A protein has these predicted regions:
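Alpha-helical segments in transporter systems
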Residues: 21-46, 67, 71, 86-90, ...
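Membrane-integrated ABC transporters
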Residues: 1-37, 52-67, 85-89, 93, ...
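ABC-type nucleotide-binding domain
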Residues: 330-331, 337-586
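An intracellular "coupling" helix at the cytosolic face of ABC transporter transmembrane type-1 domains
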Residues: 17-18, 113-114, 130-139, 143, ...
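Transmembrane helix-loop-helix hairpins at lipid-water interfaces of multipass membrane proteins
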Residues: 23-81, 161-166, 277-281
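Helix-loop-helix
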Residues: 54-55, 60, 159-173, 243-316, ...
Length: 586
């Protein structure tokens, strides 16, 4: 994609809009601070010469005091300039990172479901949190420093060569030889910082995966194997962090050694020049200050470039995420559903998650208004895929899906989503009160309706046993069984009161008694709604108006339970095998 080929600077520009003035003021404050830093030693030189010339007669105390007072004033101004540029740079960088986070949040909502199916949650979360934070912290620590130090080095060079080219040459050559040596290390550090961010994402993803599946890991006695895998990933992260931080940490001591070496050379060469009468003592004193001023920003530049490389690696991952292909823009689609009856028609639908592999083949079926339609079949038959297409989570490759005669391709995704209530196999409840969970993103839901829906699915009594009833906050202190969580999600779907209903494995994780309660409530409350039920337990869908039997992405049988049993085909074999298994279990 074009965005991925763009430079980081070009990709960053939209997020810097409106911050240019603050950055300009920070830049000017940096220039002022550097001018003061460079100008100070020239006045110190004058002060030293005044004192040295007055040793044989008398020191001009008034002149020395005037220079001292002047230096105090300009150094205070320099201090304020430093604070101003640091404040403005920090503010701009934090605003930049805030905009990045906002862009990522908007991006998540515009990505197709296929992206999340193909990427681990840990990797995505690492880009949203760790990478943005790393970029912000690294930029905050280095951007102002590198800019200020670069300008300072330039100003010091001009001043030193204007004062004495011999001492200036000694300072520059001795310092740059060491800096060239350091640049070799910096060239290798970029790859290590990139590996650090990737390895951190891998560790986050693995921890999230093992935490969410902790019960399975424990039941299979796989704790030791997961420890070994984590140890491998953790050691890889340790290795990449160690390498990047070792190179980062060694630069400052090297540059300090170079600074001290240059300092000694300036004193030796300066003393020789002074003995020959070529320079004054004041120039030596000034150059002693300039050596420190010159070598320190070079050290800071080396350290800052390392941080910028770390920021570059992190921002590269963030912009890679922001450049992912989004869902189709549907702002031009205006078809809406009104006075819905609930008829759904699949007309020769074909679909594949990848272009080279078709999952659903020429699928056709009709669900009349108010019917209960069950979709059954072995694992991998395409049942859940049909629901994903029905909800427009994915775009179909061929054919059409029509709701009350309107092709879903002509409607916005939000319009299709509003037409459905949905209970997924994966239970999702957020940290908030039970009431907030039940009326999620819906307005005008009264407490009476909340209680009515809860009673309909048999969860009201349990809720009232909790200390705060419907105001109980669902967090780590509240323990709910899988069945209770599922009942809450079913009540939430019922409160939405949409004309179409999808139940994906809705009762597969509850006990028999709870399943019976749910089934009775569903049968009563699904009246007048077109319902699609996916269940591996065929006993739960015997009263369906239409059963679609799928295998390898095709409908191989359809009819009601009695008709399909009379055919003695694939459905009958599935049903009889489950019935036999249930008897054996009993």
């Amino acid at each position: 994609m074009e965005n991925k080929k763009m430079s980081l600077w070009k990709q960053s520009k939209p997020y810097l809009a409106g911050l240019q003035f603050a950055l300009l003021i920070a830049f000017l404050a940096t220039i002022l601070s550097n001018i003061i830093t460079v100008y100070g030693p020239t006045r110190i030189k004058e002060m030293t010469n005044i004192i040295a010339s007055g040793l044989e007669t008398s020191v001009d105390v008034a002149a020395v005091a005037a220079i001292g007072a002047f230096l105090a004033v300009i150094y205070v101004i320099g201090l304020l300039s430093n604070y101003l540029q640091a404040f403005l740079f920090t503010t701009a960088i934090q605003r930049f990172s805030e905009r990045l986070r906002r862009a990522i949040a908007e991006k998540i909502n515009s990505l197709p479901l296929g992206y999340f199916d193909g990427h681990s949650q840990g990797d995505t979360l690492s880009r949203v949190t760790n990478d943005v934070d790393t970029a912000a912290q690294s930029l905050n620590q280095s951007l102002g420093t590198v800019l200020s130090s670069s300008l300072l080095v330039l100003a010091v060079l001009v001043t030193m060569f204007g004062m004495n080219w011999i001492l200036a040459l000694v300072t520059v050559v001795s310092t740059l030889v060491g800096f060239a040596f350091v640049s070799v290390f910096m060239g290798k550090s970029q790859g290590f910082f990139k590996s650090q961010q990737q390895d951190l994402a891998a560790v986050n993803g693995y921890v999230e995966e093992m935490y969410s599946g902790h019960n399975v890991v424990t039941s299979y006695n796989a704790i030791e194997s997961t420890k070994e895998e984590f140890a491998t990933l953790n050691h890889r992260l340790y290795d990449s962090i160690w390498k990047s931080q070792f190179i980062s940490g060694i630069m400052m001591p090297i540059m300090m050694f170079i600074g001290n070496f240059s300092y000694a050379l300036v004193i030796i060469v300066g003393a020789a020049l002074a003995l020959n009468g070529q320079i004054s003592i004041g120039i030596i004193v000034a150059f002693m200050a300039y050596v420190r001023i010159f070598s320190q920003p070079l050290s800071q530049i080396a350290q800052g470039i390392t941080s910028l490389q770390q920021a570059s690696a992190a921002m590269g991952r963030v912009f890679e995420f922001l450049a992912e292909e989004e869902m189709e823009d549907e702002s031009h689609k205006e078809r809406q559903l009104s006075d819905m009856k609930g008829q759904v028609v699949f007309d020769r639908v074909s679909f594949g998650y990848t272009p080279d592999r078709t999952i659903i083949h020429d699928f056709s079926a009709t669900a009349h208004a108010g019917q209960k339609v069950a979709i059954v079949g072995p694992t991998g038959a395409g049942k859940t895929t049909i629901v994903n297409l029905l909800m427009k989570f994915y775009e179909i490759d061929k054919g059409s899906i029509r709701i009350d005669g309107i092709d879903t391709k002509e409607m916005k995704r939000s319009e299709v989503h509003d037409a459905f209530s949905m209970v997924l196999q994966d239970i999702w409840l957020f940290e908030g009160t039970i009431r907030d969970n039940l009326i999620y993103n819906q307005e005008g839901i009264s407490d009476e309706r909340v209680i009515e829906a809860s009673k309909a699915v048999g969860i009201h009594h349990f809720i009232m046993t909790l200390p705060d009833g419907y105001d109980t906050v669902l967090d780590d202190t509240v323990t709910l069984s899988v069945g209770q969580k599922q009942l809450l999600t079913i009540a939430r779907a019922l409160l939405k009161d949409a004309p179409l209903l999808i139940l994906d494995e809705a009762t597969s994780s509850v006990d028999t008694r709870t399943e019976e309660l749910i089934q009775k409530a569903m049968d009563r409350l699904m009246e007048g709604r077109t319902s699609f039920v996916i269940a591996h337990r065929l006993s739960t869908i015997r009263n369906a108006d239409l059963i679609l039997v799928m295998k390898d992405g095709n409908i191989i049988e359809q009819g009601n339970h009695d008709e399909l049993m009379a055919q003695a085909g694939f459905y009958a074999d599935l049903y009889n095998s489950q019935f036999t298994e249930d008897e054996v279990e009993e």
